[in-house]
From Swiss-Prot:
HAMAP family documented for this protein: Chorismate_synth
PROSITE patterns linked: CHORISMATE_SYNTHASE_1 (PS00787), CHORISMATE_SYNTHASE_2 (PS00788), CHORISMATE_SYNTHASE_3 (PS00789)
Residues reported in the UniProt entry to bind NADP(+): 48, 54
Cofactor binding summary note: Reduced FMN (FMNH(2)).
Protein name, entry field: Chorismate synthase
Binding site for FMN: 132-134, 244-245, 289, 304-308, 330
Name of the gene this protein is made from: aroC
Cofactor: FMNH2
Naturally occurring in which organism (per UniProt): Methylobacterium radiotolerans (strain ATCC 27329 / DSM 1819 / JCM 2831 / NBRC 15690 / NCIMB 10815 / 0-1)
Length: 366
C-alpha cells in the first residue's frame, strides 16, 4: 500500500492500524530551532481522543504521544527542547483494542465501509476495526498538525461543527468560546443543547448521523499557493477529502456561490493599510487564483453518517453468499464530532507546506 505520505516540503507519513500495536507519523521537513514539547502535541490529541463523552465511541485510548526523534535539548538550548531539522517520529500506542468484536465480519463486507474495496484491491484486509481505513489513523494526523502549527507564525486555526444531520447552527449566535464548552465543538451553545437530545435519540435507535465541519485559518499571509496545479485551495480540498468519511469539500461560499449574481459574489476592495487592498467581503474564502489573499481561509466539508450501526443491513461474503449484518463493537454515532481537531490539523499541515514553498519562490524574498 503506497500513498501514505502527503506534502512537498513539509511532509507527513502516517503509519499503523486500528488494532495494531501502535500508530504514528514521521514529519519530514520541519525547520530546525522550533520549540517542541510532547505536552503541546498531547494537548491537541486530547481534544480528539475517544471515550470523552457518551456521544463518541467508548473505546478508551489515552493516546499518549512519544517523540522518538527530531528534537534535542541541552545547556546550549537553554534547556528547551528544539527541533533539529531531522525527521520527527511520533508514536501513539493502542491499548484498548477488542478485536473479538469483529470476528463475525471477517469474511463479510460491511456496507458503507472500505471492506470490499480493500479486499478487491489488495487481496487481504485487516478486518479488526477497519485496520488502516479506520478513523483511528487520524490521531497521527493530529500529532503532525501540532508540529505544523509551529511552522506558521501568527496563524490561528480553529474549527467547529456547524451542522449535524439536517440541523444547522444559527450563525448569528456563533461564539468561538462556546466550541470548547460542549462535547460537539459547536459554536452555537443553544444548538449544542439540542444536539444532545438529538444524538441521544439516534444512539437509542442504534443509528448514526453525518455532520458539516467548518475550519477557519486567520492571519494567513497573502501569497501562499501557486497557479494551476499548486493551488492552495486544491491542496486543502485534497487534504480534507483524505479524512475518513468525508464526502464533499467547499472553499468560502462554495456551492452557494453558484446561486449568486456576479456583483454579489465579487470580493470588492478599497484602499487599506500599508498600501495593500482591504477586501469588503470574503466569498472566496481567502483564496483567489489558488493563492491566499490575506483574508481568513475558510473550508467546509461534509462527513457521512458512521457506517457501523446496529440496524441490520444486507450484504455479501467474500464467497458471494448473501447475509444480513449487524455491526458490533464501539463506534461513534456521529464521527463528524471528532473530525473537528483533525480538520485543524490538516489545515495546519497544508499551510505549513505552502509557507515553506512560498519562502523559496517569492518576489523580493518576502
Amino acid at each position: 500500500m503506497s500513498h501514505n505520505t502527503f506534502g512537498h516540503l513539509f511532509r507527513v507519513t502516517t503509519f499503523g492500524e486500528s488494532h495494531g500495536v501502535a500508530l504514528g507519523c514521521v514529519v519530514d521537513g520541519c525547520p530546525p530551532g522550533l520549540p517542541l514539547e510532547a505536552e503541546e502535541i498531547q494537548a491537541e490529541l486530547d481534544r480528539r481522543k475517544p471515550g470523552q463523552s457518551r456521544f463518541t465511541t467508548q473505546r478508551r485510548e489515552p493516546d499518549q504521544v512519544k517523540i522518538l526523534s527530531g528534537v534535542f535539548a541541552d545547556d546550549r538550548t537553554g534547556g528547551r527542547q528544539l527541533t533539529t531539522g531531522t525527521p520527527i517520529a511520533l508514536m501513539i500506542e493502542n491499548t484498548d483494542q477488542r478485536s473479538k468484536d469483529y470476528s463475525e465480519i471477517r469474511d463479510s463486507y460491511r456496507p458503507g465501509h472500505a471492506d470490499y474495496t480493500y479486499d478487491v484491491k489488495y487481496g487481504i484486509r485487516d478486518y479488526r476495526g477497519g485496520g488502516r481505513s479506520s478513523a483511528r489513523e487520524t490521531a497521527a494526523r493530529v500529532a503532525a498538525g501540532a508540529v505544523a502549527r509551529k511552522v506558521i507564525p501568527g496563524v490561528t486555526i480553529r474549527a467547529a461543527l456547524v451542522q449535524m444531520g439536517p440541523h444547522a447552527i444559527d450563525r448569528s449566535r456563533w461564539d468561538w468560546d462556546a466550541v470548547g464548552n460542549n462535547p460537539f465543538f459547536c459554536p452555537d451553545a443553544e444548538r449544542a443543547s439540542f444536539y444532545e437530545t438529538y444524538l441521544d435519540g439516534l444512539r437509542k435507535d442504534g443509528s448514526s448521523v453525518g455532520a458539516v465541519i467548518e475550519v477557519v485559518a486567520e492571519g494567513v499571509p497573502p501569497g501562499l499557493g501557486a497557479p494551476v496545479y499548486g493551488k492552495l485551495d486544491a491542496d486543502l480540498a485534497a487534504a480534507m477529502m483524505s479524512i475518513n468519511a468525508v464526502k464533499g469539500v467547499e472553499i468560502g461560499d462554495g456551492f452557494a456561490a453558484a446561486t449568486l449574481r456576479g456583483e454579489d459574489n465579487a470580493d470588492e476592495m478599497r484602499a487599506g493599510n500599508g498600501g495593500r487592498p482591504r477586501f469588503l467581503a470574503n466569498h472566496a474564502g481567502g483564496i483567489l487564483g489558488g493563492i491566499s489573499n490575506g483574508e481568513p481561509v475558510v473550508v467546509r466539508f461534509a462527513v457521512k453518517p458512521t457506517s457501523s450501526i446496529l440496524t441490520p443491513r444486507r450484504s455479501v461474503t467474500r464467497d458471494g453468499a448473501e447475509v444480513d449484518l449487524v455491526t458490533k463493537g464501539r463506534h461513534d454515532p456521529c464521527v463528524g464530532i471528532r473530525a473537528v481537531p483533525v480538520a485543524e490539523a490538516m489545515m495546519a499541515c497544508v499551510l505549513a507546506d505552502h509557507y515553506l514553498r512560498h519562502r523559496g519562490q517569492t518576489a523580493g524574498g518576502g
